[in-house]
Amino acid sequence: MKKMYAAALLTAGVLCLTSAVSAAPSQTAAQETVKTPLQQMHMGTSEEKNHRAEIQADYFQHRGERRYINLYNLHVFRQYKEMHGMSLHWGLTVTRPVGSWAEKDAPTVRLDSGAVGVGPSYMVRWTKPLGKKWEASLDLTGGLMVYNKVHPAHTRNYDFMWRIGPRLTYHFNDRNALSIAYLGHHVSNGQRTKNPGYNGVGVSIGYRYTY
């Protein structure tokens, strides 16, 4: 009788052990299923959008009376958002105005206004694809420039710089693209006094890298 009782206990123990081993993988899988959303929350998913960096070089020639200031600009942008054909970019601009201007009371006296400026900039771009390799866009850029001296002469040492115009881009491959634009610009400090705003038109060459 004792032997039969011991055999029954042994059989029951083996069955319990087998059930526990079989249930372990299911519990582990369930735990992993629960952890996955948390891991995605902290680590992000692998399906992240591409980042785009762009560098642009401009040359603008002056337009308007008594304003003889040409611009050489260098911009570096990073795209941070894209939606419905519109993209948003933030960046940095370095500008080198060269030339002079004349006050209204002394139109023949040219005041040297060469300077170097730097400041944050922001670009909004509307893009329309033209096939697999080409795209056309309209760029609108605004920036706050701070100069190493008063610019233009006899005014202030800061300005707002605006650019607008069409751009044509050619994609060499999925990562590299080259563009050219025809832009107009306006520079002004936004004040009622000491604000000889000036305008210009010119070309811009850009290189974009997708990573």
Where are these regions (language model features)?
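Bacterial N-terminal signal peptides
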Residues: 8-18
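Short glycine/proline- and aromatic-enriched beta-strand/turn motifs that initiate or cap beta-hairpins
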Residues: 20-81, 204-211
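Predominantly the C-terminal beta-signal and adjacent terminal strand-loop region
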Residues: 39-52, 167-211
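Transmembrane beta-strands of outer-membrane beta-barrel proteins
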Residues: 47-55, 86-92, 118, 136-142, ...
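Extracellular loop and loop/strand-boundary signature of outer-membrane beta-barrel proteins
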Residues: 60-63, 105-112, 148-154, 189-194
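Gram-negative (and chloroplast) outer-membrane scaffold detector with strong preference
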Residues: 70-149, 208-210
